[in-house]
Curated annotation (Swiss-Prot):
Entry keywords, A to Z: Amino-acid biosynthesis, Arginine biosynthesis, Cytoplasm, NADP, Oxidoreductase
Gene responsible for this protein: argC
Catalytic activity: N-acetyl-L-glutamate 5-semialdehyde + phosphate + NADP(+) = N-acetyl-L-glutamyl 5-phosphate + NADPH + H(+)
Active site (UniProt): 157
Single annotated GO MF: NAD binding
Protein name, UniProt field: N-acetyl-gamma-glutamyl-phosphate reductase
PROSITE patterns reported for this sequence: ARGC (PS01224)
């Protein structure tokens, strides 16, 4: 198998570390350069000791001179840091941005939630994203857009969980799009590796749960609404059709997301049986090898997907309130970030989607 060289920027963080962990065992990719900021000149093993195969790589400065010359460049940088850098990179390289700089299609959405310079939207790296239903009655998917892509925007982790939970309902018109509520239990690694008051002391973090970015302020909201618009077969300009009350909650686990997403069912959808509604999810993810729709009544659990690129999905109906409840469990660093990015890279290079990726979680 041909080996493609890879440079990873942001190599000492959580997202960069997970990308390196997966790439270290990937049969088609070889990590030959790592870059950082405060870690320049140090061995990678000082920061990512769980990857002994790459321990002797020296962290270099995050510059085009270091990153160029590789077949693949992975940018695991905070939002606002990758946009200007990416504009200077070699056009021949395949670049995947794990940050937010190239996810949003509308500048107004960027200005409202991020601010600063707005950068060009890249090919969106969620292969299973539904883009409406074709004239043949089959789901159109983002996967086809990724074949041969040179610039890939990795989705947000919360975005991934929320989108995978509800997009079948959006595509089939089952719910009132002004009634969507998403509550997510999120592990601490989702907040990044920088020290914060909320996660600095184990004595305060463990055994405690706390919401954050409440009141419609979380930066993943416009991206989720953008995805819902696409699932309905609409453009990003129609994202305002979707109202989303979104609340993430930090819970005392190192990684993982459990998304609970609800919306009012339409009268037509209420006429369907629970089995018919469950079957819509089964059909929506048929052939999507990383998405597992669980048997009726079996609820997703973060423990069952840790370390994998899998997503476990379930749907239930509350007949008394006329509400649909959809659930997704993912590993935020793998399926939610690095694993999904490498799945997209596999597609871009014409490899099997699952090359170098696991569908099996770690238990206990």
């Amino acid at each position: 198998m041909t080996k493609y060289t890879v440079a990873v920027a942001g190599a000492t963080g959580y997202a960069g570390g997970e990308a390196l962990r997966i790439l270290a065992a990937h049969p088609a990719f070889e990590v030959t350069a790592v870059a950082g900021h405060s870690s320049i000149g140090h061995r990678l093993g000082e920061y990512q000791p769980h990857i002994p195969q790459l321990a002797d790589l020296i962290v270099e400065d995050t510059t085009p001179a270091v990153l160029d010359g590789h077949d693949v460049i992975v940018l695991a940088l905070p939002h606002g840091a990758s946009g200007a850098l990416a504009a200077q990179l070699d056009d021949d390289a395949v670049v995947v941005d794990l940050g937010a700089d190239h996810r949003l299609e509308r500048q107004q959405a960027w200005d409202d939630y991020y601010g600063g310079d707005f950068y060009q939207h890249w090919t969106y790296g969620m292969p299973e994203l539904i883009l409406g239903i074709g004239s043949d009655g089959k789901y159109v998917r983002q996967r086809d857009e990724l074949t041969g892509a040179k610039r890939i925007a990795g989705p947000g982790c919360n975005v991934t969980a929320t989108t995978l939970a509800l997009q079948p309902a959006i595509a089939q018109g089952l719910v009132d799009t002004k009634s969507i509520v998403a509550d997510l239990a999120v592990g601490y690694s989702g907040a990044g590796k920088n020290l914060k008051r909320t996660n600095l002391l184990a004595s305060e973090a463990m055994g405690s749960a706390s919401p954050y970015s409440v009141g419609g302020t979380h930066r993943h909201i416009p991206e989720i609404r953008q995805n819902f618009a696409h699932a309905a077969g609409l453009g990003a300009s129609q994202a305002d059709m979707f109202s989303l009350a979104f609340t993430p909650i930090l819970v005392p686990m190192s990684r993982g997301i459990l998304a609970s997403v609800s919306a009012k069912l339409t009268d037509e959808a209420l006429a369907l049986t629970d089995e018919q509604i469950h079957d819509i999810w089964v059909q929506a993810y048929e052939g999507q090898e990383f998405i597992f729709v669980l048997d009726p009544g079996v609820m997703p659990a973060t423990q069952n997907v840790l370390g994998s690129n899998a997503a476990h999905v379930q749907v239930a109906v509350d007949r008394r309130s006329g509400t649909l409840h959809a659930f997704t469990a993912i590993d935020n660093l793998n399926r939610g970030t690095a694993g999904q990015a490498i799945e997209s890279l596999n597609i871009a290079f014409g490899l099997n989607d699952a090359t170098g990726l696991s569908k099996i979680g770690v238990a206990p």
